[in-house]
Regions:
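N-terminal FAD cofactor-binding segment of flavoenzymes
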Residues: 2-46
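Central helical "cap/lid" subdomain
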Residues: 7, 11-12, 104-159, 220
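Active-site substrate-recognition segment that forms the wall
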Residues: 145-198, 209, 213, 217-218
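Flavin (FAD/FMN) cofactor-binding core of flavoprotein oxidoreductases
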Residues: 208-209, 213-251
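Short FAD-binding loop at a beta-strand-to-alpha-helix junction that anchors the flavin cofactor
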Residues: 242-270
Length: 270
């Protein structure tokens, strides 16, 4: 869930460039989403894109990251620190970062699983633990996100987005029509196949190729463009349940995140 606000030529643009929406399948998550709706943190974007299937697609009213900021209000969050070592001492954990040490009774790791594996390897003897075998097998899809600011309106139909429309693009959205940007800017998520093909190429050339492709596909005229690469955009396989409790370490270690529960925001929440 990633959003950003930028100013270009004295104009404000806000865009989502990670998860674009979420759905609800369980009562537990549905109850929570209803509460967010009452607080005007989220709203129904649409019931489908090219086809209306009747299932609500929810969006955050001010960008997806804004929802995270609201629900984490009051928590003490340490940012811009890399965990380099994890230790367990009888009844508590100690995490060492490039700046400080942190201690806690429980440890919950929600990073993409390849990063989770590297963290777990810093725990003495954990690399030989059977629990690592399953998560080591999970592979991820890559995604290159192209963000474009526009000097004029796009020609996108309501609700302003297209999903899985061809072999090059997984999702393309006009953030103004979506309702989060005061000026027109488009987010385009390249397909895994195209992202893999272009991943190691020169970034300027990649951007030019993607801009040309999207211009030909939608007949739009971007003024400025940016890229963001998602190395772990989506897991190719999901794990059952909503978390893993590791039997060792006195049941004080848990693995969670969107790889559980269907690779969706709902799975990460539950």
């Amino acid at each position: 869930m990633a959003s950003k606000t930028i100013f270009v030529d004295n104009k404000e643009f806000r865009y989502d460039y990670g998860a674009q929406f979420f759905t609800v399948r369980s009562k537990e998550f549905g109850d929570q989403v209803s509460e967010w709706e009452m607080k005007k943190l989220v709203k129904v974007w649409c019931n489908g894109f090219e086809n209306n299937d009747g299932h609500n697609r929810y969006m955050s009213t001010n960008g997806m990251r804004d929802l995270l900021g609201n629900i984490s209000s009051g928590l003490k969050i340490q940012q811009n620190q890399k965990v380099t070592k994890i230790e367990y001492f009888d009844d508590y954990w100690r995490l060492g970062t490039n700046r400080a040490n942190f201690e806690s009774e429980l440890l919950v790791i929600t990073t993409p699983l390849p990063q989770c594996v590297e963290l777990l390897k810093t725990i003495p003897t954990f690399d030989h633990h059977d629990s690592l075998d399953e998560i080591k097998k999970i592979e991820y899809k890559k995604c290159i996100a192209l963000i474009m600011t526009m000097g004029s309106e796009s020609n996108f139909d309501s609700p302003g987005a297209y999903q899985m429309m061809d072999e090059d693009w997984d999702f393309v959205s006009d953030n103004k029509i979506k309702g989060i940007s005061p000026n027109t800017c488009v987010t385009a998520h390249a397909s895994n196949a195209l992202s893999e093909h272009l991943w190691n190429d020169d970034e300027a050339k990649v951007k030019d190729q993607l801009v040309d492709k999207i211009k030909n596909r939608f007949n739009i005229k971007p003024e400025h463009s940016f890229l963001h690469k998602w190395l772990y955009a989506q897991s190719k396989k999901n794990l059952e349940g909503y978390f893993r409790k590791i039997a060792s370490y006195d049941n004080r270690l848990f693995l969670a995140g969107e790889v559980f529960g269907g690779s969706k925001i709902e799975g990460a929440y539950l």
